[in-house]
Amino acid sequence: MLRRYLATSASATASATATASASASASASKNSIKSNFKFHPEYKFKCGLEIHTQLKTKYKLFSLSRTSFNDTPNSHISYFDVGLPGTQPKLNPEALYLALKAAVALNCEVQQMSRFDRKHYFYPDQPMGYQITQNFHPLAKNGYLTFNEFDGVEIATSKDGANDTIRIEKIQLEQDTGKKYGDIIDYNRAGIPLIEVVTKPDFDSIEKVLAFVKKYQLLVRHFDICSGDLETGAIRVDVNVNVNDSPRVEIKNISTTGDIVNAIKYEYNRQVETLTKGGSLEQQTRNWDGIRTNLARSKENAIDYRYFPDSELPQIILSPDIAHDIKTSLPESPDSLLARLTSSPHNLQLAHAKNLITEPELLHYYESFFAIHRKPDADKWVFQELLTAFAKLGKTFDVEIVKPNVFAHLVSMDLNLVSKRLILKHMVQNEVSLDKAIEQLGFKEDQKPTTELAEDICKEIILTNQQIVDRIQSGHAKAVEVLVGNAMKKTRGKFAAQTFRSLFKEQLGIS
């Protein structure tokens, strides 16, 4: 029976291709939802979120199978993961620690006692016949996340700031399910540790929903709790929507921020239309298919999960000081970092500051570089020059190739920008030291300049002097001397003028 559900790579790929095709055909409908939407004053919008977040652990929540996201289907499963009789769970302490980090970061009250419960239902992606979760005694309660000027939403002017704060009802630690591809299942995901973050229905606008999700992504990435990616399923969002305090409707299967927005808009319009026609709304669970929400089940046929405590797992008993100890061990918060990086002396663009926060290694690099090169253009050197050099060569940023103190030395050298770019490119491409790059490119006085260097300089000048190039190619060949003069100036006479003249004529195809 189990083998019938095991996935293969070929089947998974075919399913993914079909999904992509369906998504493309839905594009026009999504755009229509977006352009025609508006809130109606007489129909009050209320929304809450349930965010399922995969924790970045080495092993699964209750087994020693490694966590896997892109490996061959069913290559990381244990007997316990597929529910074979006689197997028992053992809690992964790393997962508990990451869940506690999230609870503290979200200002929650960590519970001294929590425990696991069994949530019973039958579905092929849950081979045990139940999910281990925390229904009765969750790990943490009563948290909040507050918006500020960095979140792109209108800040409340009331003294209590209530409209700026989204309350968090609870955080529970639980196991993920397998992943279904049509009629087959990949159990690599089964048992991966999750936290479910449940908010209160405090959202009164779509902008705040979107801002909260992005702020949450930034937070879990910065504290290295989760990769924070919606597209890969590392974060999955269920949205609860109601109008005029009617019974809530839960929308499942939302995998991108764009789909979150469109699903809310569609569901709000559906509920408003029902009420304007004199109908009534009922509690429902609906699925989002990329175009509309579809009924999955109503209150009348809701699943009775028959929760009860898991007798194979002991209670989690924590020290009263655990929250304080974790809080003091966490790095500077994202909000504090944003405030510091966007103000003097850094004055970073907000987008660049957020980028640094999601990449701890890059943040450390920038701060080490800035400690040496304390100038307003530090931002430009890191983002426009250093990272661009890696990106253009199709390489992942690696601090060992160009260390911050070495980069600061290169930036301070008495060379023009083109020369510094050429040296940086050579270092990244060939993974050589600064001194070696300077020697190989011929920047030392006792070394002969290379043709490669002269060619790159000519290409750079051609790209930045399009009007002169157009004039040359329209028949005014003598205008090439303007380019030669620019090249001589940039290289401070390091090359013979005839070298540049010949290269420009060759690259521009003139005689």
UniProtKB/Swiss-Prot annotation:
Signal peptide annotation: none
Keyword terms: ATP-binding, Ligase, Mitochondrion, Nucleotide-binding, Protein biosynthesis, Transit peptide
GO biological process: glutaminyl-tRNAGln biosynthesis via transamidation; mitochondrial translation
Top-level class of the enzyme under EC nomenclature: ligase
SMART domains: GatB_Yqey
UniProt-annotated location(s): Mitochondrion
EC number: 6.3.5.-
Family: Belongs to the GatB/GatE family. GatB subfamily.
Task performed by this protein: Allows the formation of correctly charged Gln-tRNA(Gln) through the transamidation of misacylated Glu-tRNA(Gln) in the mitochondria. The reaction takes place in the presence of glutamine and ATP through an activated gamma-phospho-Glu-tRNA(Gln).
Protein name: Glutamyl-tRNA(Gln) amidotransferase subunit B, mitochondrial
Source organism: Lodderomyces elongisporus (strain ATCC 11503 / CBS 2605 / JCM 1781 / NBRC 1676 / NRRL YB-4239)
Organism ancestry: Eukaryota, Fungi, Dikarya, Ascomycota, Saccharomycotina
Gene: PET112
